[in-house]
Each structure stands twice: as structure tokens, then as C-alpha cells.
Amino acid sequence: MIFYDKLKPADVLVIGSADGRVIEAIEYIADLHKQHGFKFAICLGNLFSHKRTTSADVVKLKNEKVKVPIPVYFGVGTAGLPESIISHMAMYGPEVAPNLFCMGICGFMKTFYKFTIAQLGGSYNEEKYYQPPEKFEQSLNEKCFHRSDVQKLSKRCDILFSSEWPEDVQENSTLPERKLPKGCMPLAALAANCMPQYFFVPGPVYYEREPYKNSAAINVNTGTVTHFVALAPFKNSKNEKFSYAFTLYPLTTEYMQPAPPNCTASPFEHRPIPLKRASEDQIIPQQTNKFHKSKSSTALFKSKKDSSSSLNKMHKSESHSALNNLHKSESGTSLNNRRSKVGPGSCFFCLSNPNVALHLIVAIGNEAYMALPKGPLTTTASNTPALASSGHVLIIPIAHASALSTLSDTSYEKTLNEMNRFRKAVTDMYNACDSDALVYEISRANGVHLHWQMIPIPKISSHRIESVFLEMAKEAGYDFEERDVEPHELNYFRVFLPSGKILIHRLQLRERFDLQFGRRAAAKILGLEDRVDWRKCVQTEDEEKAESEAFKMCFKPYDFT
């Protein structure tokens, strides 16, 4: 299996539901591929069906009597799969024939060309959608999707395709209104969360709305425009358009595309994933009045009724204790505010910047380094006697990256591994000084330069870390989930607890997240509320140099660099 290291544009073919005419559909794809040279193809709806797909069809594909010339991706659709396909997948995985990949009812896949595809098959049945997970039985013959499927897929992708339509797709469109499938709320919410470049559905008719902008919360350099396309059934009697060819561009600056002039606002803005029926007390996590732990997902939820609380109003401080004042322009911004791009030459977390404060750097690895912050939260007075420095340190990727997920796969793995190695080394240092490690991170697509904050908490106080974070999240109206981030996930606040538990708050579209939240919580745990604003804690250069030397002495037994 060949994966291509560098992202390049790819020509893609999508066809409407073949309704079981799988051989005819594959031959059609093969003919077009000979003419145009597609990189991969997607089959919407029911590529296979119990009624029209014969066992002979399946044998032809498996034995390559009918060859699939390029990777072709499909989902379960609404008709289920033939038993022979289900049995094959149980034994051999999703490749049901050479180059033919089934993504099941709920699937997320990276193509050979490193584009990501999310797929939600099956139909929407309200009763089954809201069933408790332990009562919901799903198989490749099951024709319904569950709310947990929608949750799993809610991450950035290049292409999204589904069997059901999203509701309100014509919202904000200036095209003449048409009679289209009603659609359902979960698909609208999924589209809002995935923010795909292309969203395809099988339709009774062909329909293509104007492209829409997802949100300014995603940096213009990572793409914000979605093309929604519904394709008529494969070779339909009305001769409506059933195939769609396009060039898919990587979301990189090299291939940045301007927004089309006919772009509209998104029809799916502010669509949280529905997890409870409207008739129940808890409609969706954001509307519940009680902070609780979900039995099904271990997620922690809180109402946004208290969004006017003091914590939610505090956005005038800096997002982090930086190596200098670079990020002053971020003060008071919400996720959807745009700002000019900061390159490595002007980023004060980049070692290539001639103005970087070198005296604050305490260790340099191959992929990441550590530096002391300007204006540390902790001091030797707040720490245990054994810790002869402030102990507050930043772990920073050497590569200029707003988030780890913006790095290539190889760099992502290497950088994450080394950052975790630094985190463990500092944790060991803290532990030897009768302290635990509090680590937190803000990851944003439109951030400047990702970093992790590490703060020592004396063991006598560390039992309060989780309760304080949850308490302050409740006051601010933030939703925490007990899980780690998915590979290449974007837009979240993460806190690593000494117990090994990880809490995630997903930063929502247009959310005004308190960029000082992590430092504010740490200050409350330590009784250092007067040191929340890092600018009030700035030291002289001589004091910083002395602090740096003190940290290096403490860290020397654990320094692997």
C-alpha cells in the first residue's frame, strides 16, 4: 500500500446511488478513469443491495474479473450489504475486493493521497438514534445510525458523504427554492462539525447549492468553504446528473483557493449534535442545567445559562505566559476573530527568530524544546522546599505550528513523542520534589504557535486539581469530556491531570473561550489569584537568567537532551 508523502491536488469522481448495480457502476468508473485519470472515487447510497446484487457480481469483483482500477470508497447506505460481503469483511477487513473499500455505517478514512473522508451510512430513525448505546445493536445489515456514530465522526475532514440529507440545506441560499428531502438535524450538526470541503448525498434529484462558508473560527489558510452536492441515482431514467468530477486541493497555503464569489453563510451554523430527545429534560449537553457525567460517553456537561458569569467575561488577559509580548494582539479575541498571520521570522516561539529570548530556553531536543515563561505563575515561595525554581515551564514544538494536527504525519508523530518525553521528564522532576504536574494546552487552527504549559502543584494540594477545573468549567459554561484528543483533532482545550485522566473541552464555533482559563484554575488551586495576569509577574532579565539556571540544575538528572 503506497501513501504519498506530499499532499497534492487530486482529481476525484463521485457517482450517485447504483442501487445494487455494482458491476455496472465499477465499469462506468473504469471507463471515465481511462479518459481522465482520477485518483479515487466515491459511490453514494447503495452500491450493493440485497435485491439487485447477485452472488456472481461479488465473485467477479473478488476474482478481479471486473477490476476496480482506482481506490473506490462506499458506505452501507440504506439497503444493507449482501451476506457474502459481510462475511468477507469480518475475516479480511474493509477491502471487499482489490481497491474497493467499505466504510461501514460510520467510517473515517485517510486515502492513499492523505485526504480524509468521513462517511455516515444508514437512515435516521429517531427511536433508534436516541437509544442507550447498550441497547442499540448495529450490524452491516442495520439500516440506521446512532447518535454515537455522529459523535465519532465530528472532526475535520476533506470529504463528507452520507445516506441521509441534512435539514435546512436551502437556508441562506439565494437559489430558487426546490422541493428536496427534509433531511435531519444530526446530519446538519455533523456538517457543522466536520467542515468538509465537499459534502455529498444521494438524492432523488441532482441539486448543488452555492458554496457556503463554515465559520471564521477556522483560519482562512485552512479553508472554510463547503460545496454541497446531491447526485441523482446512477443512470436514472430522467437523465439527471448522477456523476460529479472535481479537483480536491490540500488545505495548505501552497494551494490556497479564494472563496467563490457566490458563497453564502452556512445553513448549519450553531448546530450542536443532538444527544437527547427534545421532550427530555436534557435536550443537548449545552442545554442541561445540571453538571453531570454522562453514562454513555463519560462526558462532563454544563449548561450555558451561566455564560454571563465573571469567568466568561474575562478575556482581556493573555492566552499564555509567552516568551515575550508577541501575543498581546490576541487579548480579548474569540475563536472567530481573524488576525494577520505570524510567520516563523516574527514568532517568538520560533528559534529562527533573531529576537527570541534565548536565556529562557532550558532544554532543546530534536523536535521540541522547553523554555521558561515570562511572568511564571509559581515561585519558590509557592513551591515545596525541594523545588528550587519556579518550576513553571513551556514545552514547545520547534516547527512553527499553530496545532500539532497541522504537521505532516511523520512530524506529528515525532513531535508528539518528544513533547510527551519532556512532559514525563518534568513530571518525574516534580514528583521527586513532592509535587504533581498540571499540564494544559489550547489548540486552535488560527493560533500562533502551539505549546504546553506545565505547572508544579504540591502534592498536598494536587487532589484539588480536577474538582477546581470542573467547578470553574461549570461556572464558565464549558463542556468537558473525559478522553484524549483524536489524531489531528483541532480546536480544543486539554488538561492532563496527575491521575492520568485527560479532560477535553472542544472549542465551538464562535465561542468566546477564556484564554487564561488554565492559568486561572491553577492560580485558584495554589491560592495565587493575584498572579493570574502574567504581565504582573514579569521579572528582570537578570532574575530570568537566574531562574533559568535554577531550573536547569533541578532538571539535570532528567534531561535526556
From Swiss-Prot:
Coiled coil: none annotated. Belongs to the CWF19 family. It comes from the Eukaryota. Has a role in meiosis. It is found in: Nucleus. Its main location: nucleus. Residues 286-338 are annotated as: Disordered. SUPFAM superfamilies: HIT-like (SSF54197). InterPro entries: Cwf19-like, Cwf19-like_C_dom-1, Cwf19-like_C_dom-2, HIT-like_sf. This is CWF19-like protein mug161. One of its GO terms (cellular component) is Prp19 complex. Pfam families: CwfJ_C_1 (PF04677), CwfJ_C_2 (PF04676). The modification Phosphoserine is found at residues 296, 317, 319, 331, 334. Keywords: Meiosis, Nucleus, Phosphoprotein. GO terms for molecular function: RNA lariat debranching enzyme activator activity. Residues 320-337 have a biased composition (Polar residues).
